From Swiss-Prot:
It catalyses: (Z)-3-aminoacrylate + H2O + H(+) = 3-oxopropanoate + NH4(+). GO terms for biological process: nitrogen utilization; uracil catabolic process. Belongs to the RutC family. GO terms for cellular component: cytosol. This is 3-aminoacrylate deaminase RutC. GO terms for molecular function: deaminase activity. The keyword Hydrolase applies. Its EC number is 3.5.-.-. Involved in pyrimidine catabolism. Catalyzes the deamination of 3-aminoacrylate to malonic semialdehyde, a reaction that can also occur spontaneously. RutC may facilitate the reaction and modulate the metabolic fitness, rather than catalyzing essential functions. It comes from Cronobacter sakazakii (strain ATCC BAA-894) (Enterobacter sakazakii). Keywords: Hydrolase.
Amino acid sequence: MPKQVIIPPGTSTPIAPFVPGTLADGVVYVSGTLPFDSANNVVYPGDPKAQTRHVLETIRRVIETAGGTMEDVTFNSIFITDWKNYAAINEIYAEFFPGDKPARFCIQCGLVKPEALVEIATVAHIGQPGGA
């Protein structure tokens, strides 16, 4: 099965050469997702909860556009700028993954825009269209 590019309506145009997501062999790969509006401006500066919610809602749109749900997520890579935001980010994260949690890692690092507090990249196994 060839790779399918996933670009949900209203998604910001990436500031680098990549797409929001790809689907191949029933697996959705969601690019690192930052708290950007459609013009690539950081939303909710200084608010880790609101930024995390925005990022996860964007990820959900990519996965749903590909035909999946957040329950299909199997792995998240989380990048945060400050450990002091870890609890706040986890609080919102838990709302999006109330049942069985996906595997993940979280590291502290700098992000592409200093106002961004969190970035998440995701893998979701949605199966093949029409079954399997």
